[in-house]
């Protein structure tokens, strides 16, 4: 039974960050309270009806490998699945799924309701409760105190949220939901650095008024991909297509004529928006020579009448939005059933956070999601999981955990945020990861599931399946190394005839698989192949490990060199003013950031190689003193 006032961890906000945080904490055995304005909006897809994409899907796979629920939720609600960059190397291939918004929310709700140690309540938090520079609970609008050892703030766009449509604006966390004004005001009174960002969404269109004839159709890939390592294609609901249309010169002219009604271009809206998901107004202004822009028509669900026109996010007045939509092929007679809008909200400087996402200033207070300056469901969910597990560890007075840049995209994300900070909404891309060949989608479980098991995040069924996969991979890779093909065998003739491969000496199946034109299924047609495995996931892993073995080895060696700096810790340095030779600018930055290692210090803007050398010399001298 719960003591209804005392918990180990309290999570404020039940979007993608909040729900993953609450799940992680409760799975680790902590009594967890999840507070939300509306239980009916648990894990809601507030903007686009999709999960995954370039770089983002890697985060989803990592969440899954650590026992999180996003991959499972999209497997049970995805109505179109595709592999992006399928013609490129495995490092940048990314899964993307269209979601049925209602099914997604219902799946998240079902998972949360089955979770032990978790209580979900409807309440708006207006204040935090502090004791000796530590957070010890929250105060709700109806004056109820809830106490805990750790608090995770995952308030999304609700802190100081303001919606803009044309030159009109009003306070809201998202359309139809009120802003958390009191909590925003209270947090601004603390010594936390806060600023404003904005994001936007397109109008929603009645599917019954769209003319899909003559539009490019986009179906699911075959075979249909699966997100979760525990998933199966049978989990997917019915698959339906999306459609592609384009803006045109008429569309662009309508927008140009109405820029004086845009809150972005009239100065009403100050916050910076996402660089890689600009409004249609931004596209027209920034790319004046473009004759058209893509618009993907994405159904919001199997039973929904809403279509999400991906590519025309806008905050222009509703009457202008109607003109824009009517100018686009297939949408000439379409009816808008919800206007597009921009929303401006508070975010807190992530440089004020440790790599565990705990505040450097307030013990026990963790931040996750859009309030850290990120954009996207996947970025939010991955931060939520990390904040939740560390809030749980903190409540047990146990040292926190975070992945390194060479271990996970989540490691890249939190290192970028806490080391570099951000002035615009941060979106994950594969290009942000310097070790992306080692951080592929297919090996997320091999990188993280054992860690998740030690942390208490991975249940028995996932652990058993993971170990079976590892055994299958190891057994098959050893078999392929031992299985040889003779140059005088019938298989040699097949290789010459079908693949123009001439054998001059005996070759192993493993060596053969290294060749670019050979796939695992090609080996299965050879007489000497004998019995292989049928696990497609393991087969993909085997192919990638064998084909890219040389590149992976070189990257592993690079990681080893990199780890020397990551494992050279700076915790012994309390005041950088005392180190001779550092410039005043470097001293200020090091004292402000408080990097945990030489590696992290080297990634801070303005920290020069000369400064790193001085730090290394200082550490060597200090180490020598301690040996005397």
Swiss-Prot record:
The keyword Cell membrane does not apply. One of its GO terms (molecular function) is flavin adenine dinucleotide binding. It is found in: Cytoplasm. FAD binds at residues 13-18. This is tRNA uridine 5-carboxymethylaminomethyl modification enzyme MnmG. It comes from Buchnera aphidicola subsp. Acyrthosiphon pisum (strain 5A). Belongs to the MnmG family. NCBIfam families: mnmG_gidA (TIGR00136). Coiled coil: none annotated. GO terms for cellular component: cytosol. Keywords: Cytoplasm, FAD, Flavoprotein, NAD, tRNA processing. SUPFAM superfamilies: FAD/NAD(P)-binding domain (SSF51905). It holds the Pfam family GIDA_C_1st. NAD(+) binds at residues 273-287. One of its GO terms (biological process) is tRNA methylation. Its cofactor is FAD. The keyword Metal-binding does not apply.
């Amino acid at each position: 039974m719960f003591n209804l006032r005392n918990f180990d961890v309290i999570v404020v906000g039940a979007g993608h960050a909040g729900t993953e945080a609450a799940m992680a904490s409760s799975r680790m055995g902590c009594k967890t309270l999840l507070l939300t304005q509306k239980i009916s909006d648990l894990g809601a897809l507030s903007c686009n009806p999709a999960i995954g994409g370039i770089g983002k899907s890697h985060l989803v796979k990592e969440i899954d490998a650590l026992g999180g629920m996003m991959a499972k939720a999209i497997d049970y609600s995805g109505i179109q699945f595709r592999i992006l960059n399928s013609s490129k190397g495995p490092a940048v291939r990314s899964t993307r799924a269209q979601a049925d918004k209602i099914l997604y929310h219902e799946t998240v709700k079902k998972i949360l309701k089955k979770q032990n140690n978790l209580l979900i309540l409807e309440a708006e938090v207006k204040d935090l409760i502090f004791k000796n520079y530590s957070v010890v609970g929250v105060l709700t609008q109806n004056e109820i105190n809830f106490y805990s050892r750790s608090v995770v703030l995952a308030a999304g766009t609700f802190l100081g949220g303001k919606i803009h449509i044309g030159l009109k604006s009003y306070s809201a966390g998202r359309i139809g939901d009120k802003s958390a004004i009191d909590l925003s005001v209270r947090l601004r009174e603390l010594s936390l650095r806060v600023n404003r960002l904005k994001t936007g969404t397109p109008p929603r269109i009645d599917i019954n008024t769209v003319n899909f004839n003559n539009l490019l159709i986009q179906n699911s890939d075959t075979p249909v991909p699966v997100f979760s390592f525990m998933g199966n294609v049978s989990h997917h609901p019915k698959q339906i297509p999306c459609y592609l249309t384009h803006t045109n010169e008429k569309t662009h002219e309508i927008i140009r004529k109405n820029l004086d009604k845009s809150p972005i271009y009239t100065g009403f809206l100050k916050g910076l928006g996402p660089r890689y998901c600009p409004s249609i107004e931004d596209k027209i202004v920034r790319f004046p020579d473009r004759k058209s822009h893509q618009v993907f028509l994405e159904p919001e669900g199997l039973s929904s009448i809403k279509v999400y026109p991906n590519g025309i996010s806008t905050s222009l007045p509703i009457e202008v939005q109607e003109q824009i939509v009517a100018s686009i092929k297939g949408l000439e007679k379409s009816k808008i059933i919800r206007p597009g809008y921009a929303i401006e909200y508070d975010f807190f400087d992530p440089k004020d956070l440790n790599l565990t996402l705990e505040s450097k200033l307030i013990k026990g207070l963790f931040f996750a999601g859009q309030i850290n300056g990120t954009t996207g469901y996947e970025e939010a969910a991955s931060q939520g999981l990390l904040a939740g597990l560390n809030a749980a560890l903190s409540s047990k007075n146990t040292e926190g955990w975070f992945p390194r840049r060479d271990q996970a995209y989540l490691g890249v994300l939190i290192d970028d945020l806490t080391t570099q900070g951000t002035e615009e909404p941060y979106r994950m891309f594969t290009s942000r990861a310097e070790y992306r060949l080692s951080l592929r989608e297919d090996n997320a479980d091999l990188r993280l599931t054992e860690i998740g098991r030690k942390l208490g995040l991975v249940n028995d069924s996932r652990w058993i399946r993971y170990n079976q996969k590892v055994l299958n991979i190891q057994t098959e890779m050893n078999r392929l190394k031992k299985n040889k093909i003779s140059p005088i065998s019938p298989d040699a003739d097949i290789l010459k005839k079908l693949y123009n491969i001439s054998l001059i000496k005996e070759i192993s199946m493993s060596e053969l698989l290294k060749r670019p034109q050979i796939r695992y299924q090609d080996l299965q047609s050879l007489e000497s192949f004998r019995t292989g495995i049928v696990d497609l996931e393991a087969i993909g892993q085997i192919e990638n490990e064998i084909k890219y073995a040389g590149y992976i080895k070189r990257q592993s060696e690079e990681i080893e060199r990199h780890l020397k700096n990551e494992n050279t810790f700076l915790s012994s340095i309390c005041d950088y003013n005392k180190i001779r030779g550092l410039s005043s600018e470097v001293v200020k930055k090091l004292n402000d950031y408080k990097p945990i290692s030489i590696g992290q210090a080297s990634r801070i803007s303005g920290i020069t190689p000369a400064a790193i050398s001085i730090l290394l010399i200082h550490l060597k001298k200090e180490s020598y003193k301690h040996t005397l």
